[in-house]
């Protein structure tokens, strides 16, 4: 009888702990969704995508996220969905063509929907950093100069900020510290 009561107590405690953790995680996700001003369903699914970021399944999950965001007329989450596909290829670092393709896909969508944050992030923090990490500093510099020219022509502060940051990184990698300092 005593053993039976202890196992019931342990089972009750386990249920309580599970429910507590479930509701705590749910409340946290809802708060984050509210903080980022995004639909809680989209945000929850985005988090699931992030959990699978290094697995090929994230590509189809990102397509689903894109469609869900499209149904809710959420252009920002559509950009995030395409960016997630780019992130998968960037972190795999095995297919340069895919990195270029998805960088351009993010840029095209971001340009069409006036979201420079995603436009310049994809270009600088994915494509140019990919080149930099693979020792291709001249191509990285070429892309950064193209990006700088465009950001200057459009007087885009987000783009200029990303350009200065990436130029500094490129010159640091090239061990041209005086040039790197100029871009900081």
Model-derived regions: residue spans:
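Intrinsic-disorder-associated, low-complexity terminal segments enriched in Asp/Asn/His/Tyr and depleted
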Residues: 3-4
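Sec-dependent signal peptide recognition
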Residues: 10-19
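Hydrophobic h-region of N-terminal signal peptides that target proteins for export
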Residues: 19-29
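A "functional boundary" signal
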Residues: 27-184
């Amino acid at each position: 009888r005593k053993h039976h009561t202890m196992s019931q107590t342990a089972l009750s405690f386990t249920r309580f702990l599970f429910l507590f953790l479930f509701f705590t995680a749910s409340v946290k996700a809802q708060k984050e969704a509210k903080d980022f001003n995004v639909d809680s369903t989209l945000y929850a699914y985005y988090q699931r995508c992030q959990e699978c970021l290094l697995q090929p399944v994230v590509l189809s999950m990102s397509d689903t996220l894109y469609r869900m965001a499209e149904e809710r007329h959420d252009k920002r989450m559509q950009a995030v969905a395409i960016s997630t596909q780019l992130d998968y290829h960037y972190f795999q670092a095995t297919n340069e063509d895919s990195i270029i393709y998805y960088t351009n896909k993010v840029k095209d969508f971001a340009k069409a929907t006036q979201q420079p944050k995603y436009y310049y992030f994809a270009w600088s923090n994915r494509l140019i950093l990919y080149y930099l990490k693979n020792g291709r500093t001249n191509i990285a510099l070429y892309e950064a100069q193209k990006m700088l020219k465009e950001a200057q022509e459009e007087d885009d502060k987000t783009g200029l900020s990303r350009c200065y940051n990436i130029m500094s990184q490129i010159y640091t990698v090239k061990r041209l510290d005086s040039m790197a300092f100029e871009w900081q």
